[in-house]
């Protein structure tokens, strides 16, 4: 992609952490419980549908007892998460920030959670075109079937320009950071020919609404 490309770029700061909603936690595949860990009151998670209220179990050398499975984020609490890189591998850490302190919930491979989450939500574009996942995640999509020269922006049709506007809206309103590189080669047999590369902050992709918007944009020219 060395020539004839159009860039939509917002050079904001990649966020270290952000707040999420209960529906996001459910989309990741977790249930949130109030109970005890080794006899001390705590919040913790389990894989969705695998544990029941009143159940006591041992995991990782600790004893868990579930008093109540939550149906929403507790009052005056926040669900927070961040991406960290350790020994060259990314992890999603998330925890519950409450008036009584922080309760670590899990530290998981973000690639596995995104795969589970995107598959369940049928975000097929994200699943198909994702490249690498770290503090940022990149997507690459190549729909060029006949070799030709990329067109200048002035020759982009309205539908293609709309895609670029939608990308700007995502960067401005949802992620605050992003780089979208686009080449357009015109139409062949009523099919848009294009190539794109999109870099976004990984942490924002764990938001159901953000992933939904990105998935829709990636499908707009198909």
Curated annotation (Swiss-Prot):
Coiled coil: none
InterPro entries referenced in this protein's UniProt entry, alphabetically: UPF0128
Signal peptide boundaries: none
Family that this chain belongs to: Belongs to the UPF0128 family.
Protein name: UPF0128 protein TK2294
Species assigned in the record: Thermococcus kodakarensis (strain ATCC BAA-918 / JCM 12380 / KOD1)
